[in-house]
């Protein structure tokens, strides 16, 4: 070690465990002259120089102390050349320069150190910065010592563990080798015993007599450890491996002793180690390959490595384990479909065995092939496992079947749906109740969206759902009827019962909800409420005035007449129904409408039917999921919670769900994502199955095109809300015929984007925007690609324009008009003209340029046009009945006397849907 006073001491213990230290790296401090009497202490790393050759080492003459009268001045020790260690029988080893030189060098060592200590001149005291640098360097050195000590302890512990493992492996190999030798002894029993014993007896003296030291061609350094066999008894085992500790300590001792000539100190010679016998081929194959052992062997080929030995042991261990291995029977969970590879993993069987079993059953499959649950169950049972079949739809279990706590049930507001025919005043009636004006904001004066509102009457809340009355919005009316408690059927007193009125009655009956009839527009002179009541009887709606149980109220939305009576009738019906809900449970409900807002993202209008919905909860709505970011009521205010029968807008969904989907609150995001992915995958599978069913094979497609000639009108539809998209698609489906139909390439809620333009360009489709517009990028892309974008805000106009465009795809109707018949009397062959038929018109007339058919024996031989029509030698336009004429066909001359010529006119008429 090196201290700050440059006092170097050398400790050479007899035996010390080899540890990892920085090789030749120490830290020291030097003083740097900064000029003008200033100095600076700098911490540097010093590296010891180790000579590689004996002649490189320069002997250092020690400083002789002052002579004493009793003892003569010591003589400086001269550096000795490195001598090879000689193995002696007694295990003793002598080194030149015995104990006397040791005593002399030992007694003179303190005097040499005292004389070698440098005596510098102190220029000035250290500054505070220099003291701090020294203190910091000292602390860093101490910290490094602690880390190195910890590292040495860890290395020592790891080395002990490895040594124990190696000893255990050697014991196992020794046992295996003993078994192999015993087997070999039985085989070689016929050989003479003396010959068998001669081999090991002759090997041992040879190994003992082998010279231990071995010189090399190049000069070796004094610090290099002489290569010799270990002297420890355990190292002389049959394997012939030297232990790492002794060899390392020996080399370390020699290395430490290499600097003895410089200090004039001699270390006691180590005892000589006996020579080791040469390793056999089997021992070399089992031994560990190192650089030292590889250089020590004399020309023998290198054997197996340690990794090869470990692989052999592992293979032997596996073979032993497989012999006594017992089959483990498991419970295998089988979904609806599973791959063979996954099935084999769940059974802990090899996929090859499963493939072999299937081959025996006559099925050639690969590990990646998908099989159904029935075949998977057969395979699992055949391999002895028990089967538990599950369905993918099990992920939806427990969402909507939660039971309500009877003790927590409280009264809730009724949900009322306004239904009826278009333009019968449904929205106007609701506006009069809400004291709002929604009708003025509706395009065309008709409702094209489903809306939900909540009003309060005498301290009681009532939730109203306004549904469209147009024929295109059948699905909306059906959803409104399913999510409601009471249906208010609005019938105009001047228009009576209409088709959508009948449809609304059927929806209410199918949903099993009571009906309250509101006879509107009684302020008109032509109003006839009694006629309305009588017509309702035909559809099994019996009002109270006719002896039934259905409440009816005559109202006027325009003059706001009897609106309070209508609300009282609704509250009376709700009291009869005794509507209750549990607000403490998790929320469930129905999606009334969904849209994609540019600033807020996906927005869903929902009706909470059970429980209480709060911001921050995770919900699943259809195939979409999300965390509720905000709740907005019908007035546009943010609310902290939504109780039963309360309509709110939800922000935070990942996408726009379909109108009519049910939503529920789930416990965590993973469950919500799992349910959403399952539903999306199910929707994709259905779409693929639908397309596959429509597409069929190539032969079916060609036959359909040849027979039916079906033409498609591709469209990309974007609307403001999901319900409008649904209504538009339903209306366009009704326009389709056997020859032409509308094909919706893509539909969705939201503005027209650049991706829609790309899709329309790829499919050669037109783009329809309903209450939405295209952004600037989409408009630029459409102009560049030549894609037409049509904007609409009334569904009537949209359907009419698409109908007209689809009519243009219809092939025109071919209408044929019979003109007359002519009989060929004689055929003339005229030069430069060809054959000309002399005919007499026997029926109707014959016109020039009309279509003709040549009929022979009641069989049509040719169909074409007339080339010439002459009466005598003059060209005429037509020949009436009873007159004779000459006719020639275009590109046809196979005419004979007695044939009949049929003349007709063809007209093409444009068709409409």
Curated annotation (Swiss-Prot):
Residues 556-558 are annotated as: G5. It is found in: Cytoplasm. One of its GO terms (cellular component) is cytosol. Residues 131-180 have a biased composition (Basic and acidic residues). Pfam families: EF-G_D2, GTP_EFTU, GTP_EFTU_D2, IF-2, IF2_assoc, IF2_N. Transmembrane segments: none annotated. This is Translation initiation factor IF-2. It comes from Agrobacterium fabrum (strain C58 / ATCC 33970) (Agrobacterium tumefaciens (strain C58)).
């Amino acid at each position: 070690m090196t201290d700050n006073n440059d006092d170097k001491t050398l400790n050479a213990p007899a035996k010390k465990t080899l540890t990892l230290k920085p090789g030749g790296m120490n830290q020291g401090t030097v003083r740097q002259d900064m000029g003008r009497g200033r100095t600076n202490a700098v911490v540097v790393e010093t590296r010891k120089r180790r000579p590689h050759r004996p002649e490189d080492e320069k002997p250092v003459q020690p400083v002789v102390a002052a002579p004493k009268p009793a003892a003569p001045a010591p003589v400086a020790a001269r550096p000795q050349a490195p001598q090879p260690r000689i193995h002696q029988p007694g295990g003793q080893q002598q080194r030149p320069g015995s104990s006397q030189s040791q005593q002399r060098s030992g007694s003179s060592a303190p005097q040499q150190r005292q004389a070698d200590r440098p005596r510098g001149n102190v220029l000035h005291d250290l500054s505070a910065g220099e003291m701090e640098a020294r203190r910091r360097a000292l602390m860093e050195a101490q910290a490094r010592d602690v880390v190195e000590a910890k590292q040495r302890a860890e290395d020592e512990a790891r080395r002990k563990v490895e040594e124990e493992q190696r000893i255990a492996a050697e014991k196992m190999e020794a046992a295996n080798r003993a078994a192999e030798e015993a087997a070999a002894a039985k085989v070689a029993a016929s050989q003479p015993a003396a010959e068998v014993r001669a081999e090991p007896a002759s090997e041992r003296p040879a190994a003992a007599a082998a010279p231990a030291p071995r010189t090399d061609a190049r000069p070796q350094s004094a610090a290099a450890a002489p290569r010799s066999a270990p002297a420890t008894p355990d190292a002389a085992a049959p394997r012939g491996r030297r232990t790492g500790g002794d060899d390392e300590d020996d080399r370390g001792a020699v290395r430490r002793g290499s600097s003895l000539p410089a200090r004039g100190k001699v270390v006691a010679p180590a005892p000589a180690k006996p020579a080791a016998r040469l390793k056999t081929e089997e021992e070399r194959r089992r031994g560990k390959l190192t650089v030292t052992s590889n250089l020590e062997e004399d020309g023998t080929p290198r054997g197996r490595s340690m990794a090869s030995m470990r692989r052999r042991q592992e293979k032997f261990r596996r073979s032993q384990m497989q012999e006594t291995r017992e089959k483990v029977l498991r419970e295998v969970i089988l979904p609806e479909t599973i791959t063979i590879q996954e099935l084999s993993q769940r059974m802990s069987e090899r996929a090859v065995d499963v493939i072999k079993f299937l081959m025996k059953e006559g099925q050639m499959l690969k590990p990646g092939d998908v099989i159904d649950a029935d075949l998977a169950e057969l395979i699992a049972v055949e391999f002895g496992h028990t089967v538990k079949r599950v369905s993918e739809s099990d992920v939806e279990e427990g969402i909507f079947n939660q039971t309500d706590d009877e003790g927590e049930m409280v009264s809730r507001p009724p949900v009322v749906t306004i239904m009826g025919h278009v333009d019968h005043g449904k929205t106007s009636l609701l506006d009069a109740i809400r004291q709002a004006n929604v009708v003025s904001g509706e395009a065309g004066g008709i409702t094209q969206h489903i809306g939900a509102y909540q009003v309060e009457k005498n301290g009681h809340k009532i939730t109203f759902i306004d549904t469209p009355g147009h024929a295109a919005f059948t699905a909306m009316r059906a959803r409104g009827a399913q999510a409601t408690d009471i249906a208010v059927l609005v019938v105009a007193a001047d228009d009576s019962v209409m088709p959508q009125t009948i449809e609304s009655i059927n929806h209410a009956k199918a949903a099993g909800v009571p009906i309250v009839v509101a006879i509107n527009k009684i302020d008109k002179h032509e109003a006839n409420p009694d006629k309305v009541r009588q017509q309702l009887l035909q559809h099994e709606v019996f009002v109270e005035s006719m002896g039934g149980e259905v409440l009816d109220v005559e109202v006027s939305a325009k003059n706001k007449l009897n609106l309070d009576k209508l609300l009282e009738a609704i509250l009376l019906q709700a009291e009869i129904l005794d509507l209750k809900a549990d607000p403490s449970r998790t929320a469930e409900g129905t999606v009334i409408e969904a849209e994609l807002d540019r600033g807020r993202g996906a927005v869903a209008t929902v009706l909470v039917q059970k429980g209480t919905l709060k911001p921050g909860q995770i919900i699943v709505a259809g195939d979409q999921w999300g965390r509720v970011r905000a709740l907005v009521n019908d007035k546009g205010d943010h609310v902290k919670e939504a109780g039963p029968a309360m309509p709110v807008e939800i922000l935070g969904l990942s996408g726009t769900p379909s109108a009519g989907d049910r939503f529920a609150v789930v416990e965590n995001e993973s469950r919500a994502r799992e349910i959403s992915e399952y539903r999306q995958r199910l929707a994709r599978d259905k779409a693929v199955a639908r397309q596959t069913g429509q597409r069929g094979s190539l032969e079916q497609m060609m036959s359909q095109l040849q027979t039916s000639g079906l033409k498609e009108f591709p469209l990309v539809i974007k609307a403001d809300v999901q319900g409008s998209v649904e209504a538009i698609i339903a209306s366009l489906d009704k326009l389709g015929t056997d020859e032409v139909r509308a094909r919706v390439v893509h539909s969705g809620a939201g503005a027209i984007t650049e991706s829609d333009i790309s899709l329309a360009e790829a499919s050669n489709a037109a783009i329809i925007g309903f209450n939405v517009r295209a952004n600037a990028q989409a408009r630029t892309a459409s102009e560049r690609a030549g894609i037409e974008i049509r904007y609409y805000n009334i569904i009537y106009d949209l359907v009419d324009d698409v109908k007209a465009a689809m009519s243009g795809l219809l092939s025109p109707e071919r209408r044929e008009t019979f003109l007359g018949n002519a009989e060929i009397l004689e055929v003339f062959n005229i030069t430069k003209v060809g054959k000309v038929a002399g005919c007499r018109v026997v029926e109707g007339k014959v016109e020039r340029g009309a279509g003709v058919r040549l009929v022979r024996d009641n069989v049509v031989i040719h169909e074409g046009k007339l080339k010439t029509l002459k009466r005598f030698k003059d060209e005429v336009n037509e020949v009436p009945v009873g007159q004779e004429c000459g006719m020639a066909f275009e590109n046809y001359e196979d005419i004979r006397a007695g044939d009949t010529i049929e003349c007709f006119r063809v007209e093409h008429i444009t068709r409409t849907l």
